[in-house]
């Protein structure tokens, strides 16, 4: 008998035997109903569902049935237990856009940042306490008597990608009930190896924050069984439409970030600052060489350094960090550019275009963000249009209503001046003109046509918001060789940017494949007593030029490059930096050689003289 059928029979028997008392357990009943809501949302609006079925054999009915069994089998579940069931249910999608956050305050962390090397060793790369006996460069061997690899596996979710392991290593020192984690407290014993080779064990205290909201399972028995009597005036709230039942974000307005980003960002701010945090302004890489110029203020770390190639020829190389595409949360925003950081980006690009031979973009540890802000930055890194990935989407009346709104808004726009009057000079830095108007109009028409024709469940591929190309910025353009550093902690727009640059041949990608969070994100909130703060799901499947999806696959670099144990143990990243410099300088030397060959004196072609017969005029 197949496992699925056996599970169905067992579930049926268990449910029948327990249904009489089931409704009296409000905690279990709430979780069961919330599971039904989530199942419905996945079946209705989760675009990658067929892809997950094909790639992982993920089956919605089987996974839902398994979660229901876990609820039924637990005699008196706590809200904490139910949250873990719901969290694991959505996590099983293997999607960094898909996840649940909860109204919980319980969390714990250890003030160290750990990182996994290319050869599987874990090192301390940041220390944020003056107390304790753990230092930069220490290698972690065991956690509470468990070997480091076993400890990582015990915390890992997903299929085993580099991104999954990076997330598990973060969880070694940071847990939060808001993500459905089991939160430790007290003392953790770490066994470590010093750079000198000395091995020792040391205790570390978890910085623990208790739960202040409380578990609904403790409140449920106190709720009176009789229905409260309300005065008729209370009905006014319903008639006025104040008590909305749920809300969700639209593809026209939502950020493309992983589900955990907002909670993680808040926790990082509350705990300690680190250049190893996702979205850090400076990033964790050291300077690549002697600095000739530096942008030391504002949200963009940028400088120019000098380096020599193998022939001893000097070069001026630019470095520019893009830490996040959530521009409203950029670190270091100054008053002059608080509402328009892209203007400062343009000024930096102008200087780099004038003063450098090539540019290295550091996009490591980027959480994603706004598509328009991403397009605005890319528009300044090219002098020719860049084709964008298309998206296969799921449409509901929400998208149709938004499309109608955009159609009405842009109906009488016929000039660039009118476009600016209606849309503004830029949309998060991306210039608005009639090209932008046409893009939005085309997308709106595509949505409406798809709705009318029934092409609403994973539609035909179309450009997101209609922008089939990123057009060059009219004022700021970097035209010289471009190199982008990427890693497994690049999500969403952090996947999209390298995909666009690679597919258009605009940049050489160096590093590790990106996370593979490929699509726009929609977030849903709905009334519940399971403590669900928000549900995040992927609303589209991004399709690259070659027809491949970004979801789960990520964007592979041209040149695979990770961090050696020496990089992490010394925190100087010498091997990594030297490898990147060699790649850049070799490329510049080869380009110079090709340029010389093309411009070298050619043999003068033989001149062919044509003689025309002399004609005599008739007299």
Swiss-Prot record:
Biological processes, Gene Ontology terms: proteolysis; signal transduction
- Pfam families in UniProt: PDZ_4, Peptidase_S41
Where do the segments described as Disordered lie?
A: 591-619
Stretches that traverse the bilayer: none
A GO term, aspect molecular function: serine-type peptidase activity
Looking up SUPFAM superfamilies in the UniProt record yields: ClpP/crotonase
UniProt similarity note = Belongs to the chlamydial CPn_1016/CT_858/TC_0248 family.
Q: What is this protein called?
A: Protein CPn_1016/CP_0837/CPj1016/CpB1054
């Amino acid at each position: 008998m197949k496992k699925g059928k056996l599970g169905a029979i067992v579930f049926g028997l268990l449910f029948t035997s327990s249904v009489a008392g089931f409704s009296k357990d409000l905690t279990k009943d709430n979780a069961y109903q919330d599971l039904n809501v989530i199942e419905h949302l996945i079946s209705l609006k989760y675009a990658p569902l067929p892809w997950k079925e094909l790639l992982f054999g993920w089956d919605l009915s089987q996974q839902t049935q398994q979660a229901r069994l876990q609820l039924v089998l637990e005699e008196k579940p706590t809200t904490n237990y139910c949250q873990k069931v719901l969290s694991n249910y959505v996590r099983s999608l293997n999607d960094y856009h898909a996840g649940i956050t909860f109204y919980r305050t319980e969390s714990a962390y250890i003030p160290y940042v750990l990182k996994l090397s290319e050869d599987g060793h874990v090192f301390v790369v940041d220390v944020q306490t003056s107390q304790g006996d753990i230092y930069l460069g220490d290698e972690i061997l065991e956690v509470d008597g468990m070997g480091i690899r076993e400890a990582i596996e015990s915390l890992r979710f997903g299929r085993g990608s580099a991104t999954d392991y990076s997330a598990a290593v973060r969880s070694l020192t940071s847990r939060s009930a808001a993500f459905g984690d089991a939160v430790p407290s007290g003392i953790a014993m770490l066994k470590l190896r010093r750079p000198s080779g000395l091995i020792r064990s040391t205790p570390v205290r978890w910085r623990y924050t208790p739960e202040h909201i409380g578990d609904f399972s403790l409140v449920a028995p106190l709720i009176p069984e009789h229905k409260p009597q309300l005065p008729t005036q209370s009905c006014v709230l319903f008639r006025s439409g104040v008590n909305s039942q749920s809300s969700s974000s639209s593809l026209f307005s939502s950020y493309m970030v992983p589900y955990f980003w907002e909670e993680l960002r808040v926790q990082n701010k509350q705990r300690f600052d680190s250049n190893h945090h996702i979205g850090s302004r400076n990033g964790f890489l050291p300077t690549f060489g002697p600095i000739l110029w530096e942008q030391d203020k504002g949200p963009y770390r940028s400088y120019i350094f000098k380096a020599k190639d193998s022939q001893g020829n000097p070069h001026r190389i630019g470095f520019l960090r893009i830490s996040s595409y959530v521009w409203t949360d950029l670190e270091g925003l100054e008053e002059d550019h608080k509402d328009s950081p892209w203007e400062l980006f343009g000024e930096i690009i102008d200087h780099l275009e004038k003063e450098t031979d090539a540019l290295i973009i550091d996009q490591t540890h980027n959480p994603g963000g706004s598509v328009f802000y991403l397009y605005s930055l890319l528009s300044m890194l090219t002098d020719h249009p860049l084709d964008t990935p298309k998206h296969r989407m799921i449409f509901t009346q929400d998208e149709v209503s938004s499309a109608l709104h955009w159609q009405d808004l842009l109906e009488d726009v016929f000039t660039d001046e009118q476009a600016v009057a209606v849309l503004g000079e830029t949309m998060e830095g991306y210039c608005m003109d009639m090209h932008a108007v046409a893009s939005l109009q085309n997308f709106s028409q595509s949505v409406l046509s798809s709705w009318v024709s029934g092409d609403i469940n994973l539609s035909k591929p179309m450009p997101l918001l209609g922008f089939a190309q990123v057009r060059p910025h009219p004022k700021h353009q970097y035209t010289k060789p471009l190199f982008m550093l990427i890693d497994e902690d690049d999500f969403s727009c952090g996947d999209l940017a390298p995909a666009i640059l690679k597919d258009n041949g605009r940049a050489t990608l160096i590093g590790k494949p990106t996370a593979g969070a490929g699509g726009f994100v929609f977030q849903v909130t709905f009334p519940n007593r399971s403590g669900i703060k928000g549900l995040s799901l992927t609303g589209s499947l991004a399709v690259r030029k070659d027809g491949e999806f970004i979801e789960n696959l990520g964007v592979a670099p041209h040149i695979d490059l990770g961090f050696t144990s020496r990089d992490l143990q010394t925190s100087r990243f010498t091997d990594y930096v030297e490898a990147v410099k060699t790649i850049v300088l070799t490329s510049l030397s080869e380009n110079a050689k090709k340029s010389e060959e093309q411009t070298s004196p050619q043999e003068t072609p033989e001149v062919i003289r044509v003689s025309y017969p002399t004609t005599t005029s008739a007299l």
